[in-house]
């Protein structure tokens, strides 16, 4: 059965071209969502892949960091991919991700672990506080949190903080255990169908929260006994989703050629993030793990 790769892109077209070329395999269908604010579409539309089918989504969400719009963009991808399925796995990637294993390796890995859900769960010490702060309080102006105007960012942060404290008596009411983790996942057909079926609940409950994309899918999986039992790993958030992401050296760290050995020795399947400013590591990854390697 084929795999579906769901890509959320907004920035570098050259890097996106590398990612698409590395996923260009007859066993893959690729679904591409380009942020409505981005001007990348003109550069993407002429692209024709030789083996994989590429679907460039017409419905484009204006994605804002920390805002419900990120969840809406994910739902656009999940819903479009379901129309063309079923698929063995649905892989959610950003436009700044790259595979760090060959397509043969990736497909073999998921065949050996068929039925597992690759969803990272964060059990860190700050989870409870983060959950109360982001999920229980009301956040009213998250669409302006990262405006291109620096002064507006500062004003919005202060206003959000003030209003969230003012509205403390009117906290969101939770009737489930929240879970948190990276929004980059690889999940089964059954899991995607379930996530899509819960869309009305998700859009209502996670509205006026902060960074809900870190919580919604993990919460759905965590509260479903079958999907929770199928989690690949609960011990490590990024082992759980098989992504190599370094938050200790950056937000997240941008991989360079100096990290070649770490990338080469990692057991993870995908890594982020990359930047064309460090083109040498990107060229090395493409040569090592590209579709023709």
Language-model segment annotations:
Residues 1-293:
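ER/Golgi luminal nucleotide-sugar-dependent glycosyltransferases, focusing on the catalytic module
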């Amino acid at each position: 059965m084929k795999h579906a790769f769901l890509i959320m892109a907004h920035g570098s077209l050259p890097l996106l071209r590398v990612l698409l070329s590395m996923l260009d395999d007859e066993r893959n269908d690729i679904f591409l969502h380009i942020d409505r604010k981005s001007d990348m579409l003109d550069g993407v539309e002429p692209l024709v892949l030789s083996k994989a089918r590429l679907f460039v989504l017409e419905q484009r969400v204006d994605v804002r960091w920390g805002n419900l719009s990120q969840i809406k963009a994910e739902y656009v991808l999940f819903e479009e991919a379901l129309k063309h399925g079923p698929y063995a796995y649905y892989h959610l990637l950003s436009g700044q991700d790259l595979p760090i294993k060959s397509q043969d390796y990736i497909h073999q890995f998921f065949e050996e672990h068929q039925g597992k859900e690759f969803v990272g769960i964060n059990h860190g010490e700050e989870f409870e506080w983060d959950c109360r702060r982001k999920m229980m309080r009301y956040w009213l102006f998250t669409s302006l949190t990262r405006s291109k105007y620096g002064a507006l960012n500062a004003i919005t942060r202060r206003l959000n903080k003030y209003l969230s404290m003012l509205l403390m008596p009117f906290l969101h009411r939770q009737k489930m255990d929240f879970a948190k983790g990276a929004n980059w996942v690889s999940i089964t057909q059954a899991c995607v169908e379930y996530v899509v079926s819960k869309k009305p609940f998700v859009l209502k409950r996670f509205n006026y929260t902060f960074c809900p994309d870190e919580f919604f899918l993990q919460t759905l999986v965590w509260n479903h006994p079958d999907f929770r039992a199928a989690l690949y790993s609960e011990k490590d958030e990024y082992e759980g989703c098989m992504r190599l992401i370094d938050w200790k050296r950056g937000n997240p760290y941008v991989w360079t050629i100096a990290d070649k050995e770490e990338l080469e020795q990692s057991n993870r399947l995908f890594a982020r993030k990359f930047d064309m400013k460090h083109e040498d590591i990107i060229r090395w990854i493409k040569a090592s793990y590209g579709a023709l390697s």
